[in-house]
């Protein structure tokens, strides 16, 4: 961009014919023409930089916005919802004056280019979203997807991602309490690195991203601004990959968790002293986003002097300063008489802080550099009035053939020995095997409030030490189900996360989501996206769990090959007393095992069809959300009233996977009996939704059965906790030692 003379607003007005590199910055021709129309002149280089990042797919949701509106239009009535979609993160009331904020986001593309930094800064960004709401971060979760487990590139990407998440989270002193690790060839070259965080605050501590009050000062504080991450939102997060790994590296941000830790403490102290009017973290699009968002959400305008921004690299141009995505930075709006105290607190925590501007009583965002005005825009046009596309979408030609290729017709084991061999193969397959080698690199118990963490059904954190009030969070997604039917697949992800919260004894309250899809320019991908959003919105309405916010990640494809549609759903729940939680592990010999829900012949998209036959086809399991709700109520009541000592949801891998996990975690075996009307194969491997297996003390058997009967939930006694093997009567016996070897050796063997 031209540096001589400075491309001021005055210069831009006088030189209408100057060609600007709008295409290189990711804008389409008609989008550039719209900018010219809004301004009534050509943009300056700095204005072009701002519009290009803020109108990118990543920041503006221009392809997804028309569909995402359903989350608001179909939102269920919820007394718990305090802050919804549109802020940095959603906030829900969890009782006793406490509020919890939570959100899931993606850092997919940066994590492929630079796995460690991409994943680390993903954690840093989501944690700053939580701080910006006024909350103290208390935990993180990380739903991850990688290519085939035995592919050489997985061995490059996965260890870096895991080290980045662990390194950053551990340095912040935040326990990692949940997430998933899934392998599938469709994620080759497009790993999904989704990160979530939870924060806790009192109701009166909620803060919003708005700049109001003419004369109030705008303070930039945190790390210095450097050249890392420039154009990250427009370059990395809004494009597909085509053999351009090294050249994309400068667009990956570099994280410093110790700086972030200071930023957290500094910000929370400023909040405690009521010094902050409005606040915004600097994430995607950096200062371009923070200034335009704060100004457009407030009641006035803003004037900013870029010369006052503390730089790590003095050669940066004003355009680069506006686009930089350097990490660990925040922007606060502070009343003039409180500025000195705010700066004192920053100094105490060794955090660099500078007044870079002020709120004005107009409606313009004006930015100056070396005395010249280089930006003069209506901030709403930058932050909120970007292009909105109704992209064409169509059910793909191949969908019918895929659904007709019925997994229920695949060859099944013909003998007990074959059945036994397939059980061992399933529990030792990469997706069903223990992920302990990965999760042990994270600290689960720092801060001392972790109640449950991986491999439990959901992570659980104590919020109040005296009362035992706690929250649980589960994240789930199944790209295989969604590929077969995106509407049902999204609802199955929601149902599983809802169920995973309920099995621990917590009541599901609200949802955040991370929607990972291929290119929106492909009508088939756009159809998958539209169907998944419709399914999720309908499902949340039916379950009474509003969507509080989330993230869309598009362009997850290499060349023509898109990832499976992968909606990842996080459900947050509340429990009155964490002492009443229910774990996955079997607790005592002699306890009775009950299967809740109906088991049908449903193998489409199943772990069995993938592991044994390398097959994907047919229809995913049917979803009945009213039944899920009923199951949830019964699990919560049984947990609260001491009727069950362990509970585990049934999902990938079916009943046998759930029983093996509970047995290995508790070090206690199980003797199972195939119920009447089912064959052993369907009993063990079906992935019918809406089911859980629970261990009931004999003293509670009558009370538990009476409750299930009164509420109309099918319940079947299937066995007993006993011994040191998993035995299916009349079929096979598998010692826990053999199961442990199969279950726990796979991931270290592939990755260590």
Swiss-Prot record:
Family matches, as Gene3D superfamilies: PurM-like C-terminal domain (3.90.650.10), PurM-like, N-terminal domain (3.30.1330.10)
Pathway recorded for this protein: Purine metabolism; IMP biosynthesis via de novo pathway; 5-amino-1-(5-phospho-D-ribosyl)imidazole from N(2)-formyl-N(1)-(5-phospho-D-ribosyl)glycinamide: step 1/2
Active site: 58, 107
Keyword Cell membrane on entry: no
One Pfam family recorded for the sequence: AIRS_C
One GO CC annotation: cytoplasm
Primary enzyme class: ligase
Compartment list: Cytoplasm
Binding site for Mg(2+) 1: 105, 551
Annotated positions binding substrate: 106-109, 128, 253, 325-327, 553
The keyword Metal-binding is assigned to this record: yes
EC number: 6.3.5.3
GO molecular function, one term: ATP binding
GO-annotated biological processes: 'de novo' IMP biosynthetic process; purine nucleotide biosynthetic process
Protein keywords: ATP-binding, Cytoplasm, Ligase, Magnesium, Metal-binding, Nucleotide-binding, Purine biosynthesis
Positions with a binding annotation for ATP: 61, 103, 513, 550
Entry binding sites for Mg(2+) 2: 129, 281
Assembly with partners or alone: Monomer. Part of the FGAM synthase complex composed of 1 PurL, 1 PurQ and 2 PurS subunits.
Family listed: Belongs to the FGAMS family.
Functional summary from the UniProt entry: Part of the phosphoribosylformylglycinamidine synthase complex involved in the purines biosynthetic pathway. Catalyzes the ATP-dependent conversion of formylglycinamide ribonucleotide (FGAR) and glutamine to yield formylglycinamidine ribonucleotide (FGAM) and glutamate. The FGAM synthase complex is composed of three subunits. PurQ produces an ammonia molecule by converting glutamine to glutamate. PurL transfers the ammonia molecule to FGAR to form FGAM in an ATP-dependent manner.
Record-given protein name: Phosphoribosylformylglycinamidine synthase subunit PurL
Species: Streptomyces coelicolor (strain ATCC BAA-471 / A3(2) / M145)
